[in-house]
């Protein structure tokens, strides 16, 4: 068992060595169908859940060079570079571009986001997430959602120093999609970024080391399913 001081030291050491980005989808080039995140050079993170960067990790919204064409009911592979290093959940959200608006200028503002994927930890001597060490994630595109243009938001929350307010680290980016073959369902319970999370949410403010938690609540709404 590690003393609290040793835990903090270990977590801090890990915090400077394992940062990453979400730069591409499917077999595209880096930042081709993904909006270039502000951490594209330094692999940094967002620490303030009230910051506009919590949406797509862009202080000034700007589009990706192109759009990924996909179909409702398929999966999109979202890539982390080099891989997910820190313990914590991976989650994916989607937001549909309103009819009549341009995906290249729409920034995803307002309560427009619905969750399509989340992973969960295994409990035991320590919390372990299936995402740790992975670089690719198959994101399901719900078969019943409307056709149209969407932003697909990738998020991993590093919880290695999350025992104090503001300690959780958010690694984020947004891909641009064109979805065809969809249905007519409008997902309920949409959320806004910022707005979906509080710094004191139990899945964000948490000591994952000691005492080892026996439960974990993913931040945000439930995963939408058709």
UniProtKB/Swiss-Prot annotation:
Pfam family, one: AA9
CDD domains assigned: LPMO_AA9
Signal peptide extent: 1-18
GO molecular function list: metal ion binding; monooxygenase activity
Chief place where the protein resides: secreted
Gene Ontology cellular-component annotations: extracellular region
Catalytic activity: [(1->4)-beta-D-glucosyl]n+m + reduced acceptor + O2 = 4-dehydro-beta-D-glucosyl-[(1->4)-beta-D-glucosyl]n-1 + [(1->4)-beta-D-glucosyl]m + acceptor + H2O
Known glycosylation sites: 69
Disulfide bridge positions per record: 56-174, 144-226
Swiss-Prot/TrEMBL keywords: Carbohydrate metabolism, Cellulose degradation, Copper, Disulfide bond, Glycoprotein, Metal-binding, Monooxygenase, Oxidoreductase, Polysaccharide degradation, Secreted, Signal
Binding sites annotated in the UniProt record for O2: 160, 169
One of the GO biological process terms: cellulose catabolic process
Essential cofactor(s): Cu(2+)
EC number: 1.14.99.56
Residues the entry annotates as binding Cu(2+): 19, 86, 171
Record note on cofactor: Binds 1 copper ion per subunit.
Biotechnology: Lignocellulose is the most abundant polymeric composite on Earth and is a recalcitrant but promising renewable substrate for industrial biotechnology applications. Together with cellobiose dehydrogenases (CDHs) an enzymatic system capable of oxidative cellulose cleavage is formed, which increases the efficiency of cellulases and put LPMOs at focus of biofuel research.
Similarity comment text for this entry: Belongs to the polysaccharide monooxygenase AA9 family.
Protein name, UniProt field: AA9 family lytic polysaccharide monooxygenase E
Native organism: Thermothielavioides terrestris (strain ATCC 38088 / NRRL 8126) (Thielavia terrestris)
């Amino acid at each position: 068992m590690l003393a609290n001081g040793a835990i903090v030291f270990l977590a801090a050491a890990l915090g400077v060595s394992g940062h990453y980005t979400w730069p591409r989808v499917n077999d595209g080039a880096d930042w081709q169908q993904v909006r270039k995140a502000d951490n594209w050079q330094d692999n940094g993170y967002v620490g303030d859940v009230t910051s506009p960067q919590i949406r797509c990790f862009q202080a000034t919204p700007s589009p990706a060079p192109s759009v990924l064409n996909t179909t409702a009911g398929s999966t999109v592979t979202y890539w982390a570079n080099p891989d997910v290093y820190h313990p914590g959940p991976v989650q994916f959200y989607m937001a549909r571009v309103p009819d009549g608006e341009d995906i290249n200028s729409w920034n995803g503002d307002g309560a427009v986001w619905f969750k399509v994927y989340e992973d969960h930890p295994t409990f035991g001597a320590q919390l372990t997430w299936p995402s740790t060490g992975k670089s690719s994630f198959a994101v399901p595109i719900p078969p019943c959602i409307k056709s149209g243009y969407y932003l697909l938001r990738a998020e991993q929350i590093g919880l290695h120093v999350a025992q104090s307010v503001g300690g959780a680290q958010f690694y984020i980016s947004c891909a641009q999609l064109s979805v065809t073959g969809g249905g007519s369902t409008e997902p309920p319970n949409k959320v806004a970024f910022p707005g979906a999370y509080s710094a004191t949410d139990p899945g964000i403010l948490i000591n994952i080391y000691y005492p080892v938690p026996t439960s974990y609540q993913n931040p945000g709404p439930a995963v939408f399913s058709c």
